[in-house]
Structures are given as C-alpha cells and as structure tokens.
Amino acid sequence: MFTIFKKEINVFFDSLYGVIIFSIFFLINGLFIWVFPSSNIFEYGISSLDIFFDIVPYIFILFISSITMKIVSEERSLGTFEILLSQPVSNKDIILGKFLSTWFLSILLIFLTFPYWITIYNLSNPLGNIDNIIIINSYIGLVLLVGAMNSIGIFFSSLFQNQIISFLSSCFIFYLLYEGIDMINYYDSINLVDSFIDHFTFSYHYSNFTRGIFQINSFIYFIIVMLSFFYF
C-alpha cells in the first residue's frame, strides 16, 4: 500500500500536470478571495474565512475530478493495472494506496491555504479578532469532504477506462451531492422529503462544520461515504 501511495505522489509531482493543477487551484482561489469585487475579503468587511469555505468545495469538485480521473482508468487502458495485480499486493491495497495519495494531495492543498488564516488574523481589528473555533472546524469539515470526494472519484476512475467519462461522472455526482439535491428541494412545492434528503447531502454535513459545530453524525457520514465507495 505504501509503495502505491509513494508511486502516485511521485508521478504527480514529477509531471507538469501536477504543477498546472496546483497552480490553477490557487489562482482560482486567489481571484475569488482577494480580487473579484463580488467575493473578495476586503469588501466583505468582516475578518472571516467564510467566503473561502463557501467557494473552495466547488473548486475541489474540479480539482479532485481531475486528479482521480486517470488514477485507475489510465492504468487499465495502458494495461499496467493488471501488472500491479500480478504483484504480491491485494486489489484493496492498490485502491487504498491510490485513495490515500489523492486524499493526501487534497489535504496538502488545504494545508497550503493556512496563510489565508494568518492574513485574516493580522488584518483583523483589533488584532486576532477572529473566530478560530469556526475556522478550525471548517478545516476539519473540508478535510472530510475532500476525503469523501476522492473516494467517489476513484470509484468512477475504476469504473470507466475513458478518463473524460470518469471526470464528467465525478463532477456530476459531486455537484449533485453538494448542490443538486438542494436545487431539487427548492423546486419541491410539497417539501415532504426536504429534511430527509438534506441529511444525505455533502452541503448539509459540511455546513455543520463551517458553523463551528463538530457534530459526530456529520463526521460519521463522511467516513461512511469514504468506506462505502472504497468497498464498492
């Protein structure tokens, strides 16, 4: 498992693809948080990272779909996945190693956004007048959210040999689980299943963390999603 993990990390950082993906992630984040007038922190007027935590899940939809789309499907199309299976390592160890590598890359991106936190801290008036508990819980929720997304992304990568189909399928499911079901509820005039469906959405459980609430049921929800798609 560790060998697979190390291999995937090295492949990602040894390629121009990895540099481009990381650069695009921070470019989009930076534009929304510091530049665009409708969303930048300076016009928001409050020392808070709420804007970042509202925007970043949508950026991760594209990022995670991009890094997971090829992680299994490419090896299958090239025939190298069968070579891996011939080695003294189980199929589950291969998938687990790949999952941990993509989750690690996602967590690394999250970790590299900590300067946003430091900047907000220093911009606050008086100095340090920010709600650190909300920020910490939001980061925990984001780590769990991207873990669930990576699990689903690898599932679709193993399902399809075509990387484009894998990418589009992941994007669709991520958006459906995060935003799409809420849109369905919005147009539901009866609202009989509204609260029931909400409990199955990423946004519902992620929003618990972004409100500064560590709810064990939301933690368990994300763990169940990860395990469910891993064992698929």
Each predicted region: which residue ranges?
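Hydrophobic alpha-helical transmembrane segments
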Residues: 1-63, 67-70, 220, 225-232
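Short coil/turn motifs that cap or connect alpha-helices
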Residues: 90-91
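Hydrophobic alpha-helical membrane-insertion segments
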Residues: 16, 22-24, 102-110, 167-184
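Short amphipathic alpha-helical coupling elements at transmembrane boundaries
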Residues: 3-11, 82-86, 198
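Secretory targeting signals
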Residues: 31-34, 46-59, 101-163
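Transmembrane helix boundary and interhelical loop/hinge segments in multi-pass membrane proteins
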Residues: 67-87, 99
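Terminal transmembrane helical anchor/hairpin motif
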Residues: 36-50, 166-232
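Cytoplasmic juxtamembrane interface segments
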Residues: 2-6, 72-81, 146-169
